[in-house]
Amino acid sequence: LPESNMGRLRKEGRHSTAHVYTNALFSFTKFCGTTHVAFRQVTRERLRCYGQYLYSSGLKPNTVSTYMRMLRSIYNRGVESGRAPYVHRLFHDVYTGVDICQKKALPVGELNRLLYEDPKSERLRRTQAIAALMFQFCGMSFADLAHLEKSSLERNIIRYNRIKTKTPMSVEILDTAKE
């Protein structure tokens, strides 16, 4: 993927996507033992070995899939622009699906300790207050909390668009969050 496309993604505010593309490319070139891989060097066998390398490095299936999908996207752009030869079912032998993972929730005891244990410093007290607020705002992400504006609050309801997905959200403010 040319650097201009990475720049375009960043200009569009898609920093996370650009970051994932960068990581996938870096990982693949590292696996190949070079700083640049030509499209003709990307084969079904090399991709299969790369997938095995990722798994043996301790990566989870969804991470391996993400890297493979990024490489496939780069390859497809190369084919569309005429810079890469079309290879039928090039990514057929590698995993590009998405595993449904069990959400990782804190046990109740740990959550209580996080939210209510007396912090050892003022800095930790502030961090604890922010964590409690995010929890009371239905698990709002820190990025979303940081981008909230006063205009987002209307009659005990916060309305905002998720930073990552632009999905509209509405969260009722609990009485405990007003303290």
Named regions from a protein language model:
Residues H147-E179:
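Conserved tyrosine-mediated DNA breakage-rejoining catalytic core shared by Y-recombinases
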Residues S56, E80, R113-K120, S151:
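Conserved helix-loop functional segments at active or binding sites
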Residues T17, Y21, T63, Y67-M70, ...:
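Hydrophobic (often cysteine-bearing) scaffold residues that line and stabilize catalytic clefts
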Residues G51-Q52, S73, A131-Q136:
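Contiguous, well-ordered alpha-helical segments that form the cores/surfaces of helical PPI scaffolds
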Residues R10-K11, Q52-K60, Q128, R159-I163:
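Glycine- and acidic
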Residues S27-K30, R40-V42, S56-L90, C138-M140:
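N-terminal DNA-binding recognition helix of tyrosine site-specific recombinases/integrases
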